[in-house]
Amino acid sequence: MKNLLGCSVKDLEKIALNYGQAAFRGRQIYNWLYNYKNRSKSIDEINVLPLKFRDQLKNEAFLFGELTLKEKYLATDGTLKLLLNTRDNESVECVGIPTEKRLTACLSSQVGCPMDCKFCATGKEGLKRSLKVSEILDQILFIENQMNQKVSNIVFMGMGEPLLNIDELLLSIRSINEDFAISQRKITVSTVAIPKMISKLSELSFQVLGKCQFTLAISLHASNQKIREAIIPSAKNYHIKNIIDDCREYVRETGRRVSFEYLMLHGVNDKLEHADELSNLIKGFQCHVNLIQYNHIEEVEFKQTPIKNAQLFQTRLSNSGINVSFRKSRGSDRNAACGQLRQNDKIK
């Protein structure tokens, strides 16, 4: 089966020409595929195409999408989690997060995750496989269709480690930027940090995208190596100081600041001495710390840092000259928040 989702306008023009059609037929497919207001769900719906051409595309197994909707969960704050099934009977989750002026799509890059971070539900079932470009992009279509709103922002913070699927990730970003008309500056890629991959991300971004303007978010979650190894098993292979050094180089190469994600775990990493340690670790280059509230999962007994303690931690960082904010949790009552995505209700 050949998926049209992810094809550029030139790709679609070439397909049209290969079937004896004029190039503008490819542009018509492109418009019906990516234009939010005119989007169709199947080849049959593109009634501006000749019937013969539509039949040819269907007979050659051309598709508009890869996924099917299994379940949807609406949180009290309007956050929508979708459980989607792949063609090989795996399951993946994505989340639509609405605010007054925008709709953020939280996308998955893999089915499951190999990193096994102790505070995250996704890694509890391990990695099944990486997602294809069409499967990543199809999540956007489902969110827009279910929420009747165009996606304005993208965060690769769903299931999986994006840098372990870097080729499909960058092709997806290119399509999101060029075909879905979402600026790179409205895209965030979150990674637990893989050895040598931060520099590779910078290098390949310039090769594939021509520029590197999306936000890189490092799931740091600790102020020292000992704590990080205790909650992130893969940290044993990549020392925290080496991560920061690679981030400094990334900023020099791209001109883009790095965001450090810091999940606050009560009694683990939330003391003021940890704030001081963190500020000393990351000071002196263009970065931002995003403090995150812990969202409960069944398998572990971590506790949320009390709000008062979190505010003191934030103030301590700010007083040290660190750019810092506190991310409000969304969708936790339907297990749609950070760290709660998994392969729920998988079809057997």
Swiss-Prot record:
Check the record and name the Gene3D superfamilies matching this protein. 1.10.150.530, Aldolase class I
Keyword annotations of the record: 4Fe-4S, Cytoplasm, Disulfide bond, Iron, Iron-sulfur, Metal-binding, Methyltransferase, rRNA processing, S-adenosyl-L-methionine, Transferase, tRNA processing
InterPro entries in alphabetical order: Aldolase_TIM (IPR013785), Elp3/MiaA/NifB-like_rSAM (IPR006638), Methyltransferase_A (IPR040072), RlmN_N (IPR048641), RNA_MTrfase_RlmN (IPR027492), rRNA_lsu_MTrfase_RlmN/Cfr (IPR004383), rSAM (IPR007197)
> Catalyzes what?
adenosine(2503) in 23S rRNA + 2 reduced [2Fe-2S]-[ferredoxin] + 2 S-adenosyl-L-methionine = 2-methyladenosine(2503) in 23S rRNA + 5'-deoxyadenosine + L-methionine + 2 oxidized [2Fe-2S]-[ferredoxin] + S-adenosyl-L-homocysteine; adenosine(37) in tRNA + 2 reduced [2Fe-2S]-[ferredoxin] + 2 S-adenosyl-L-methionine = 2-methyladenosine(37) in tRNA + 5'-deoxyadenosine + L-methionine + 2 oxidized [2Fe-2S]-[ferredoxin] + S-adenosyl-L-homocysteine
On cofactor binding, the record's note says: Binds 1 [4Fe-4S] cluster. The cluster is coordinated with 3 cysteines and an exchangeable S-adenosyl-L-methionine.
The chain's disulfide connectivity reads 106-338
Please indicate if the UniProt record lists Transferase as a keyword.
yes
Protein name as it appears in the record = Probable dual-specificity RNA methyltransferase RlmN
From the broadest rank down, the organism's phylogenetic lineage runs: Bacteria, Bacillati, Cyanobacteriota, Cyanophyceae, Synechococcales
